[in-house]
Amino acid sequence: MKEKGFVDSMALRKNLWQTVLHGEFDGYLVYPRRLCTTKVDLKKLRPMIYERIEKRANEYPVRAMVPVAVEVLKARNVLIQGVSALLQSFPVMACKFCPEIFIDEKGHLIRTCHGYKRHAKNRCHEWVAGGLDDILVPVETYHLNNMFQGVIKHNQRFDFDRISAIDELCWQAGVDPCGNIVSGNSQGSEFLSPYDLTFVANRTLTAWETLRSGVLKLLFVYPAKVCKYCSEVHVGPSGHKARLCGVFNYESWRGAHFWTKAEVDDLVPPKIVWRRRPQDPPILVDEGKGYYGRVPAILDLCAKAGALVPAKYNSMMKAQGLSGPAFCR
């Protein structure tokens, strides 16, 4: 009996080890632990890493992305011209103390203003006349000599020019943006006919979509960074070291930027605004802010001029939604 028990125990151990070696035990995968460690000599790897970085720099700019950059610059120019023309017929109001804007002759009464330096909360806006920069928010970045140059230090922050982030992205893609800069007032001050307004609005909205899709394609190839705590953008594989984050009293972070991956909205801010629909009151009130639509400013401006809005924005526009809590009773 003892010999039989010993044989059964040895057979059980043998089956258990075979199960472990095959990597499966009770439905779970079991991986044997490594019994040795691999030592890496960083002194030998450092020259290889530097050589790989130099070879990578020779691969840029990517030829296939040059037409995309050209298309982005053309779309940006058409967008500036179109918005400048539409603003002659549709005024924009901007808050005096916060970034809020509203496309109408009068502002709204929605209490979302945080005041100067964020010292207030949920107060009414104080409206003044807005302009092109309130709709197309300018985003600037440092202009690099080449894509893989050294990191800009704090004491070098005045040695580099500040240009548009779109221009810098297209310049790194192999296109010189200097010949594509246009003036925002190139359309003149003449008012357009309703037919011309609709044509300009459709062309402007198409340019907006082309610009954003082109920037998205470029960001897949050319890296860009944005600070987690402020709106600073850097086009390049790594951010700069200029300690400019938190220079305002209401910002919690002080010193160097905390860089994360930049998205399309960081380089081309959509500037979300409240949209007044036909069923809404003449002046939007605070009680109905949960019912009003919230759309990009470009979309609202072009829709007022008669442009066809893409279906993907229907949920943001709330075109068939209720006007306020009074209609829910």
What is the meaning of each model-derived region?
Residues 4-9, 13, 19-73, 77-85, ...:
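Cys/His-rich zinc-coordinating modules
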Residues 104, 236:
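Short, basic interhelical loop/turn and adjoining N-cap
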